A protein has these predicted regions:
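A cross-family acyltransferase "interaction/gating" segment
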Residues: 2-3, 17, 36, 50-128, ...
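Generic beta-sheet signal
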Residues: 36-42
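Short active-site segment of divalent metal-dependent hydrolases/proteases
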Residues: 46-47
């Protein structure tokens, strides 16, 4: 999967390194200042998709510094019966291969992409924007918030 990510201009973050996060923020700011877009996954981890983990606010800072909006987008997966699908889960001991096999082994999984209003244009700080984005995504995807 790494080669695919590299081909699509992915900016890789070394987890747990504040110094590296600062470097990444500089790179994100450069991309944003060129008028391009950057997608970040502020949970910083994977889950089974049944709840929303805490958001890390650091990677939101470049958008605020560049005067660019933060556009929260929720992605959820559903069974044709209307129940939430766990087939795309990629957490715990599940390998990427197992995750992919679970997805392609399904006859049908419905993916829902929910957009929410732009944030960060009214002087909020990154933590306020992260909290508002988390709440918007949880509401849009119908997910409970977790504190872990």
């Amino acid at each position: 999967i790494g080669w695919l990510a590299k081909k699509n201009d992915t900016i890789f973050l070394r987890r747990g390194s504040r110094g590296h996060a600062r470097l990444i923020n500089e790179e994100i700011a450069k991309v944003l200042s060129e008028g391009k877009y950057v997608a970040v996954f502020p949970e910083g981890s994977t889950s089974d998709g049944t709840c929303l983990l805490n958001f890390h606010a650091a990677l939101i800072q470049p958008a605020l510094a560049c005067g660019r909006p933060v556009l929260p987008i929720a992605l959820s997966y559903w069974e044709p019966s209307g129940e939430r699908s766990l087939a795309p889960r990629y957490d715990g001991d599940i390998s990427l291969g197992e995750c992919i096999r679970a997805i392609i082994g399904r006859k049908r999984t419905i993916a829902r992409l929910i957009t929410t209003p732009a944030l960060g244009l009214n002087g909020e700080d990154r933590r306020q924007v992260a909290a508002a984005a988390r709440e918007a995504i949880a509401a849009g995807a119908g997910l409970p918030l977790t504190s872990s």
